[in-house]
Amino acid sequence: MIFSALSAANTVVLASGEADYTPSLVSFAWIMAAALLAPLVSYMLKNKMPAVALLIIFGMIIGPSMLDLAHEDPGIGMLKELGVGALFLLAGFEIDLATLKSKQAATGFSTWLICMVSCLVGAYFLLNDIPGAIVMAIALTSTALGTITPMLKQDKLIGTKVGDSVMIHGAIGEVAPITAMALLLGTRSTLGTMLILLAFIVIAVGVAVMPRALIVAVPWLKTAFLSGAGSTNQTILRLIILILAILMAVTSVFELDIVLGAFAAGIILNRIIPDEFHKGLENRLDVVCYSMLIPVFFVVSGMSIDWQVIVNNPFKVLGIPALILVTRGLPVFLRENIHHTGSDIETTRERLQVALYAATGLPIIVAVMTIAVGSGIVDEETSSIFVAGGALTVAIFPLLSSLVKGKEENAQSKAKAAESKQEGREGAEQKGAEKK
């Protein structure tokens, strides 16, 4: 009875409101239940399964293909888009532009280019279809920077050599595929797309300089913003959300992926916010974004996975993570081992960690498959297989990276313990010799 009343398909008015919103509200309730349950289950599993992976799994469970408790209607779809924006806003906020001008960034881009060209050639020979080959190459060579950023925070890797390297590979693995999608899969000509991208860059720069220009022109604005920053007005956070909204709207109007606008907003904030305010602002953004918007994105992404497709094509679904690991993770691992990339990573285990995180992909896979299905390049079943495979990379690769890190730490602890034990023995022998 209760489950029937809470079914997303039920259109009975549950409270004094419009009946049209009832399915959205019911779906939202189930989505937030999944969002709350995920970190609790992750804690029960001693954090061996990332909460992000559980959000996707629980989304699939409550979605149309399994329990059919929640659906992605326009209202939920809007929340999902805002979740994507919040996710990449925070990812961009973590990026230091100076690192993108480094040797490591140049090596990261050349590595991605090698991955992309190799996949493109291989897919073309297999499919004998250029649009299909482009779709496969983009899907197999992306990195889910926004998705792995919370995992890096959970594993306390932000600010470390491994974390910095992952952030660089992730930034390139997000922006480069998005640009490739716009140039190679767009309905406009290549020249038209390049002009659109140039126009977006000009607008983004304008948005970046506008706050400071306004403060110079109207000096009292700074005092007004600071006085309302910690009150119910929350002027600073509202300014940030306005910048995010403007750039997401611009990319949507220009028919670009909104990830590009959100990521640009994060980078802009990193530049215009003074360093001494970064930590406090980041904590407040975490509260705003991770309490609702970002979990909604992951749960709704899980809801879009067709369980029946996984059951009918288990080997194909399992093959996608393996293929991504070979086409994206392996080149990153090999470049880190045989070439001085500037990352200063010393151990093989750390390089393996970077490779596993770099091979984690989902948002770009979802985006490129959505475009491909809409254009008739791939069918719904192929899209579901790739999305399910992308979700598996989110569930598996960060977990493997954590295990690799754990083994490394255990090995270091054992080595230190053995060293201390040996020093103790030597000290005892020395004392015994002195007594004699």
PLM regions: where:
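Transmembrane alpha-helices that form the ion-translocation and gating core
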Residues: 101-158, 299-304, 312-380, 385-408
